[in-house]
């Protein structure tokens, strides 16, 4: 069953949505859940290869062998070096409001294409989100069904990959890698550290920090993310 599912998913036209039909066959709920989980794991493993290639070292969110402690240690090291060489250093800590809920689906598929993700993987990912609807129950009854056009799926193994690519696209458009502003070390210029949506900007002057922050807020707004700092 699983072998057949992988074959249908990766070696046929995903637009035919045959793999989705297979998941709707009248099997038990337990078997259905296990099968769909295996399918998502296969898709996640293939997508992760491209995520690892696209993401820079400053992004530690949802990456194997990396964590918040690494980013804290990096920032502490930068502070120590700034004190050692008697340099000013300015930080801005950015937290996006409901970042994972604000990912625009149409924007996401365009980003995957621009970042060189194979059409097959993009199409399979898009099919997971196709036709999603929700209904809200209130004290006065329930609303009509409505389409869901934003947000990555909570608890889905693909969500970290998709969000990291979405966030990386925003940061690339801010031009952080090319910016001269930042903390100069012997080997490179560092102006940000990230853990998923949590972003730290760091520069040597207040004016540089203001310019970087305004650029980040501008590009984030274009992708429906609201930066809080």
Predicted segments, located by residue:
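Conserved pre-catalytic core of RNA-dependent polymerases
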Residues: 1-166
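Intrinsically disordered, low-complexity regions enriched in proline, serine, glycine
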Residues: 22, 52, 102-103, 121, ...
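Active-site palm subdomain of RNA-directed nucleic acid polymerases
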Residues: 46-59, 162-196, 200
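Catalytic palm subdomain of template-directed nucleic-acid polymerases
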Residues: 98-115, 193-222
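Short, conserved micro-motifs composed of acidic
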Residues: 140, 227-229
């Amino acid at each position: 069953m699983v072998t057949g599912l992988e074959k249908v998913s990766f070696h046929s036209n995903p637009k035919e949505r045959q793999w989705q039909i297979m998941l709707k066959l009248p099997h038990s709920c337990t078997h259905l859940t296990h099968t769909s989980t295996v399918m998502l794991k296969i898709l996640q493993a293939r997508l992760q290869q491209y995520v690892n290639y696209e993401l820079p070292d400053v992004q530690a969110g949802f990456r194997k062998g990396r964590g918040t402690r690494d980013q804290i240690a990096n920032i502490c090291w930068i502070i120590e070096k700034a004190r050692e060489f008697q340099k000013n250093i300015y930080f801005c800590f950015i937290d996006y409001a409901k970042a994972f809920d604000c990912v625009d689906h149409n924007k996401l598929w365009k980003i995957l294409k621009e970042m060189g993700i194979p059409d097959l993987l993009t199409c399979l990912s898009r099919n997971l989100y196709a036709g999603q609807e929700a209904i809200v129950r209130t004290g006065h009854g329930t609303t009509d069904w409505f389409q869901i056009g934003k947000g990555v799926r909570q608890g889905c193994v693909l969500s970290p990959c998709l969000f990291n690519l979405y966030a990386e696209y925003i940061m690339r458009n801010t031009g952080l890698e090319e910016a001269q502003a930042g903390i100069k070390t012997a080997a490179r210029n560092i102006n940000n550290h990230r853990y998923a949506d949590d972003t730290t900007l760091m520069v040597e002057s207040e004016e540089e920090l203001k310019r970087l922050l305004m650029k980040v807020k501008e590009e984030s707004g274009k992708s429906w993310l609201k930066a809080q700092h």
